[in-house]
């Protein structure tokens, strides 16, 4: 029988972290071994009881590195080591990812906000350590399909704008998913949205953020939303719109579990779910 995959979840009491724990506990080949969260008053409580899953005998801890150290020592086979699933905050995601690699724990990063320079540094660090990991801006298979369609459409349209919509507790803007979509559209090296008029914004930022390629990205934050993205292309006489809507966070769990299962066979850090499917 194949041993279960040891999984640590950081941000365990957050919306995404809680969904990940439910998915891990419900899977046949994963085992929850750590729950990291700094919510006041929760240190030492059983994560299963906190989430209504029954007692799991995994205590909530705020000691990130202490948890990774304990897990790395208990999992002796480095090639098939433990996995960290991180849904925390952009302000700590770089340090969390680097610490996981240093402890020989495979990072699966769902937290967005890494800069291109930080991502490059982490890729080099993981390659030197021969530790596989993944930075996934969006775990939805449907979003991967939208991104692929957007990249294909970018060959034929010179005008395009991207809009992402999220709940009002999301800390970063634009979303990592929106940035990733723009990057895929830009791989041809073309420029978008050639100027037709001399634009003037009476309210700064009205036209969204403009990338070097000319693509414009817009971010909306409202209660009631989960995660949504729209890519609109325009040409004389027509528009072409791609849209993906996540209405429940359970939609991400197949992608999370797929990444957890595959990441231990990697020797470096990959960026994007499309690299794994």
Swiss-Prot record:
Assigned GO CC terms: cytosol
Residue numbers binding (S)-2,3,4,5-tetrahydrodipicolinate: 167, 176-177
Compartmental location: Cytoplasm
UniProt keyword annotation of NADP present: yes
Residues at which NAD(+) binds: 11-16, 110-112
Known EC number: 1.17.1.8
Keyword list, A-Z: Amino-acid biosynthesis, Cytoplasm, Diaminopimelate biosynthesis, Lysine biosynthesis, NAD, NADP, Oxidoreductase
Pathway: Amino-acid biosynthesis; L-lysine biosynthesis via DAP pathway; (S)-tetrahydrodipicolinate from L-aspartate: step 4/4
NCBIfam families: dapB
Family: Belongs to the DapB family.
PANTHER family for the chain: 4-HYDROXY-TETRAHYDRODIPICOLINATE REDUCTASE 1, CHLOROPLASTIC-RELATED, DIHYDRODIPICOLINATE REDUCTASE
Protein name per Swiss-Prot or TrEMBL: 4-hydroxy-tetrahydrodipicolinate reductase
Organism: Parasynechococcus marenigrum (strain WH8102)
